[in-house]
């Protein structure tokens, strides 16, 4: 084909015959696509129907399983309970008969409890109030000890009393309070621990604020602000150094911006909630927006449910708890006499870390071994 013919073929419009042939072919392909699309839609409808049926069957199986589990537990407790024993006493006896922790977990728990006993002594000697929460409260009630598979201590304190404790320990040679911002949750971790950085024992401190606003309104308003705070954190700090250093010490330069954002949200709360500084003026307590989220909301916290505190036995000493401990535990766990599903997965301190020689030496030394 000559150069002139090739130019003519590319530049001149197609003939009527070739155009109609192309149109016929395109229409045929479009028809085939419509058929295939119709077939796919039919398959999708069938699969959707099948999924609905499977979901209904799964729900039915789960309901039957829940019923059978409940029936089996009723039969178990009826058999387990002694003639002269109350149902609650029987359940406590059962939980307290469960095997205790062994190995590294036992060593860590013994360190945690020794530290907790010393923390309690510091608080009582200095007029500082705290409340055990979450699994620590459950352990105090069910086991009079740490839960056999637990590895941390959770404590609530008012913000002003955390500050008082920090001031007490400012130049202490044995104890310290650490703070860092956690990207994963996100939250501000506040912990009471030893000056010995090789010892993994710690007590989580969760700040509460006193208010004389309506307790339920204040509680829900704080939940709203917490959600807004978390959203703003994700929007502002995603892709920053905080994401690559997920446990960010408060000495890091970027925390200035985190604290600025935090103060903005706290200021928003102060527009709607009246915060007070004394228990006498308070009608309730609210969680700080820097706290970790609860899986199930345990509030509101009317002040009469929390003050005065109630002592509960915890191994060889007593800990402070809220007087409405049953309400708190029920909101937090539902039926708290059930064995949880995270017995084997509950871990705050990695076992590999506990195995290190420096950590082992520190934990044994702290216990005087």
List the predicted regions and their residue ranges.
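Tryptophan-centered motif/residue detector
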Residues: 68, 72, 131, 149, ...
């Amino acid at each position: 084909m000559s150069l002139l013919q090739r130019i003519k073929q590319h530049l001149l419009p197609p003939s009527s015959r070739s155009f109609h042939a192309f149109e016929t072919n395109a229409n045929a392909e479009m028809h085939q696509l419509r058929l295939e699309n119709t077939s796919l839609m039919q398959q999708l409808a069938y699969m959707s129907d099948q999924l609905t049926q499977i979901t209904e069957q799964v729900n039915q199986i789960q309901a039957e399983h829940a019923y059978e589990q409940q029936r089996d537990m009723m039969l178990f407790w009826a058999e387990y309970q002694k003639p002269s024993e109350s149902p609650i006493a029987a359940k406590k006896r059962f939980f307290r008969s469960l095997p205790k922790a062994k190995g590294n977990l036992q060593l860590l728990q013994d360190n945690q409890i020794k530290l907790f006993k010393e923390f309690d002594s510091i608080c009582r000697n200095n007029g500082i109030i705290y409340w055990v929460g979450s699994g620590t409260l459950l352990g105090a009630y069910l086991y009079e000890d740490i839960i056999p598979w637990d590895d941390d201590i959770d404590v609530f304190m008012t913000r002003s009393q955390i500050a008082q404790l920090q001031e007490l320990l400012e130049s202490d040679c044995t104890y310290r309070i650490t703070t860092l911002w956690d990207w994963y949750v996100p939250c501000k971790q506040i912990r009471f621990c030893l000056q010995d950085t090789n010892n993994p024992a710690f007590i989580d401190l969760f700040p509460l604020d006193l208010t004389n606003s309506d307790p339920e309104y204040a509680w829900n308003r704080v939940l709203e602000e917490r959600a807004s705070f978390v959203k703003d954190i994700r929007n502002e700090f995603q892709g920053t150094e905080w994401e690559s250093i997920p446990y960010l010490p408060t000495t890091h330069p970027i925390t200035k911006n985190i604290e600025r954002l935090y103060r903005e949200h706290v200021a928003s709360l102060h527009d709607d909630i009246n915060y007070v500084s004394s228990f006498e003026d308070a009608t309730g307590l609210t969680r700080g927006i820097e706290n970790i989220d609860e899986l199930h909301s345990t509030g509101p916290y009317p002040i009469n449910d929390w003050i005065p505190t109630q002592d509960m036995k915890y191994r060889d000493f007593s800990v402070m708890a809220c007087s409405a401990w049953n309400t708190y535990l029920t909101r937090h766990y539902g039926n708290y006499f059930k064995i949880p599903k995270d017995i084997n997965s509950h871990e705050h301190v990695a076992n590999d870390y506990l195995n290190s020689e420096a950590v082992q030496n520190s934990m044994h030394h702290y216990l005087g071994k």
